[in-house]
UniProtKB/Swiss-Prot annotation:
Keywords: Acetylation, ATP-binding, Ligase, Magnesium, Metal-binding, Nucleotide-binding, Purine biosynthesis. N(1)-(5-phospho-beta-D-ribosyl)glycinamide binds at residues 22-23, 82, 286, 355, 362-363. Homodimer. The keyword Cell inner membrane does not apply. It comes from Escherichia coli (strain K12). Mg(2+) binds at residues 267, 279. Belongs to the PurK/PurT family. NCBIfam families: PRK09288.1, purT. GO terms for cellular component: cytosol. It catalyses: N(1)-(5-phospho-beta-D-ribosyl)glycinamide + formate + ATP = N(2)-formyl-N(1)-(5-phospho-beta-D-ribosyl)glycinamide + ADP + phosphate + H(+); acetate + ATP = acetyl phosphate + ADP; carbamate + ATP = carbamoyl phosphate + ADP. This is Formate-dependent phosphoribosylglycinamide formyltransferase. The gene is purT.
Length: 392
C-alpha cells in the first residue's frame, strides 16, 4: 500500500529535486498534482523548477558536504536527480543510511559518466555498442584514435548537450579536439571516450518505465540532433517490428541491471532490423518532452508514478506528435516572448521554461504539436517555435 501525505503538513511526502531545469519543473508539477511537497535544488537561483516548488536551495551539487547539509535540513523521502553533475558518492552514502535515491544511487553513479554505463552495457550485459576506448591523457587519446580509426567521435566521459564533443575526420583535428574535450566536461578536465562511428538509419529514445507492475515502454521517440543537442523530436518513430522488439529487449536489460523504480531514457541507434545501444539516462529525457502532448501520461507523470511506488497500468499514445525547441541567441536577464498568439492553437501548444537569463544560445521553451502524420506534426511544431520572438 502506498501512503501519500499532504504538502506542508507534518505527514507530508517530500521530494527533493537535484537539478531544477525544465525537466525538473515538469516533475515538480506532477508531484504537486499528487499533493507531494517539493524542494528544488540547483546551482543557480530562480531555476525553472524553483518556480513551482514549495522551497528551494542554491548549492554546488558536486560538493558532497553541501549536498548532505541540505538533505539533513529538508529530510526528503525521495531524492530525484535531474542532471549528471552531482556528488554521486554522497548519494550512495545517503542511500546506505536509508534515503530513497531515484531510481537508485547505483544507477545515478553508473550513468553519471559514459565509462560506467558503457562498461555495464558492453562488458557485463554484452549488448551491441560502438567500438570504444577510454583515455585520460593526450598521448593515450591519440593512441585510442589510432586504434579506433577515422572518422571517430571524442566526448568527455561526463558532459551533456554536446559539450566537449568533436567529430574527428583527420589527425589535424586531434590537438583541438583534446583541448575542447577538456573544457567541456561537467566536472572539469579529465577522462574521455573515443567512439567509432556507427552506421545507422536513425536514432531513437525508448522511454522505459520500471515500476511495481513491471517494465513498460512508450512508443519510440525519434529526434534530430544539432551540435550535440536535440532540435526536434517526434513520436512514434516508425521502425520494423523486429527492430522494436530488439530495442525493447535491450532497454529492459539495461533498466533492470541499473535497478530501482522510475523512467529511463534509453538511447539507441537503429539500422534496418539491427539495434545498437548508445546511452541511458535514469530520468526523463529532453527528447521525451513530446510526451507532454502525445500520451495520456507524460514521461514526467510516469517517472513520478513509478518512483512513488504506484502502478503504471498502461500508456496510451494518441498518434503522430512532435516537439521543436525554442532556441534563441542573445544576452539578457529580462527575457520576453512576443507573438505567442501565433504559436498556439488547436492541437498546438508551447511551454516556456522561465529560465532567468540567457547569454548566448539557450533552450528557453518548446513547441508541441499533433497532426495526421509525423512529418506534418514536425512542421507544425517547428513553425510554432519559429513564431515566438524572444527579446531581451
Amino acid at each position: 500500500m502506498t501512503l501519500l501525505g499532504t504538502a506542508l503538513r507534518p505527514a507530508a511526502t517530500r521530494v527533493m529535486l537535484l537539478g531544477s531545469g525544465e525537466l525538473g519543473k515538469e516533475v515538480a508539477i506532477e508531484c504537486q498534482r499528487l499533493g507531494v511537497e517539493v524542494i528544488a535544488v540547483d546551482r543557480y537561483a530562480d531555476a525553472p523548477a524553483m518556480h513551482v516548488a514549495h522551497r528551494s536551495h542554491v548549492i554546488n551539487m558536486l560538493d558532497g558536504d553541501a549536498l548532505r547539509r541540505v538533505v539533513e535540513l529538508e529530510k526528503p523521502h525521495y531524492i530525484v536527480p535531474e542532471i549528471e553533475a552531482i556528488a554521486t558518492d554522497m548519494l550512495i552514502q545517503l542511500e546506505e543510511e536509508g534515503l530513497n535515491v531515484v531510481p537508485c544511487a547505483r544507477a545515478t553513479k553508473l550513468t553519471m559518466n559514459r565509462e560506467g554505463i558503457r562498461r555495464l552495457a558492453a562488458e557485463e550485459l554484452q549488448l551491441p555498442t560502438s567500438t570504444y576506448r577510454f583515455a585520460d591523457s593526450e598521448s593515450l587519446f591519440r593512441e585510442a584514435v589510432a586504434d579506433i580509426g577515422y572518422p571517430c567521435i571524442v566526448k568527455p566521459v561526463m558532459s551533456s548537450s554536446g559539450k566537449g564533443q568533436t567529430f574527428i575526420r583527420s589527425a589535424e583535428q586531434l590537438a583541438q579536439a583534446w583541448k575542447y574535450a577538456q573544457q567541456g566536461g561537467r566536472a572539469g578536465a579529465g577522462r574521455v571516450i573515443v567512439e567509432g562511428v556507427v552506421k545507422f538509419d536513425f536514432e531513437i529514445t525508448l522511454l522505459t518505465v520500471s515500476a511495481v507492475d513491471g517494465v513498460h515502454f512508450c512508443a519510440p521517440v525519434g529526434h534530430r540532433q544539432e551540435d550535440g543537442d536535440y532540435r526536434e523530436s517526434w513520436q512514434p518513430q516508425q521502425m520494423s517490428p523486429l527492430a522494436l522488439e530488439r530495442a525493447q529487449e535491450i532497454a529492459r536489460k539495461v533498466v533492470l541491471a541499473l535497478g530501482g523504480y522510475g523512467l529511463f531514457g534509453v538511447e539507441l541507434f537503429v539500422c534496418g532490423d539491427e539495434v545498437i545501444f548508445s546511452e541511458v539516462s535514469p530520468r526523463p529525457h529532453d527528447t521525451g518532452m513530446v510526451t507532454l502532448i502525445s500520451q495520456d501520461l507524460s514521461e514526467f507523470a510516469l517517472h513520478v508514478r513509478a518512483f512513488l511506488g504506484l502502478p503504471v497500468g498502461g500508456i496510451r499514445q494518441y498518434g503522430p506528435a512532435a516537439s521543436a525547441v525554442i532556441l534563441p541567441q542573445l544576452t539578457s536577464q529580462n527575457v520576453t516572448f512576443d507573438n505567442v498568439q501565433n504559436a498556439v492553437g488547436a492541437d498546438l501548444q508551447i511551454r516556456l521554461f522561465g529560465k532567468p537569463e540567457i547569454d548566448g544560445s539557450r533552450r528557453l521553451g518548446v513547441a508541441l504539436a499533433t497532426a495526421e502524420s509525423v512529418v506534418d506534426a514536425i512542421e507544425r511544431a517547428k513553425h510554432a517555435a519559429g513564431q515566438v520572438k524572444v527579446q531581451g
